[in-house]
């Protein structure tokens, strides 16, 4: 986060500090949770995965600080990843859900929304890239920041790890 910090404690609870509107304000209900297993930032929000596979978020709404109701009801989230403006979560079946800044990765293109074999996701400032179980990669979000995979890379099926920087993968 660009203006706040968050820490997950041994007991599965959270503490946060910094700019209140950018993720430091946990609100009235989040401090009582004791089942947080992971937490990640977007630019101005945080998302946390709970032990039961649900996800919660807080911070700036436009950057993913509110989980849409259909996603908040899910109980099969296995990982959550943020970029500068959005979050994406992998579900147990290898599919994806996303929320936050739409043009920066929260709007999943139909072919990517239909996938059921995603094993890892990484984000940069305004795009996401996902590794599939067949060793291929897909990306979406801002094309100028790696949100479109070049054809020679899209044809690869032996990718084992993804990494990115601020504006590229």
Locations of regions flagged by a protein language model:
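Short polar catalytic/cofactor-binding loops
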Residues: 2-4, 21
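Conserved core positions of repeat-based scaffolds
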Residues: 4-7, 16, 45-48, 57, ...
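Functionally constrained cores in energy, signaling, and assembly domains
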Residues: 8-9, 26-29, 49, 66, ...
């Amino acid at each position: 986060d660009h203006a706040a910090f968050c820490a997950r404690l041994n007991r599965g609870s959270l503490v946060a500090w910094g700019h209140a509107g950018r993720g430091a304000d946990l609100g009235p209900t989040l401090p009582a949770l004791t089942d947080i297993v992971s937490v990640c930032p977007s630019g101005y929000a945080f998302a946390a995965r709970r032990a039961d596979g649900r996800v919660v978020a807080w911070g700036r709404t436009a950057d993913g600080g509110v989980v849409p109701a259909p996603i908040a009801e899910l109980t099969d989230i296995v990982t959550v990843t943020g970029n500068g403006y959005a979050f994406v979560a992998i579900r147990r079946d290898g599919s994806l859900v996303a929320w936050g800044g739409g043009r920066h990765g929260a709007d999943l293109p139909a072919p990517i929304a239909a996938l059921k074999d995603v094993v890892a996701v990484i984000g940069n400032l305004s795009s996401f890239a996902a590794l599939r179980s067949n060793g291929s990669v897909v990306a979406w979000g801002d094309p100028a920041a790696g949100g479109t995979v070049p054809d020679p890379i899209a044809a690869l099926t032996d990718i084992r790890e993804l990494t990115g920087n601020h504006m590229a993968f």
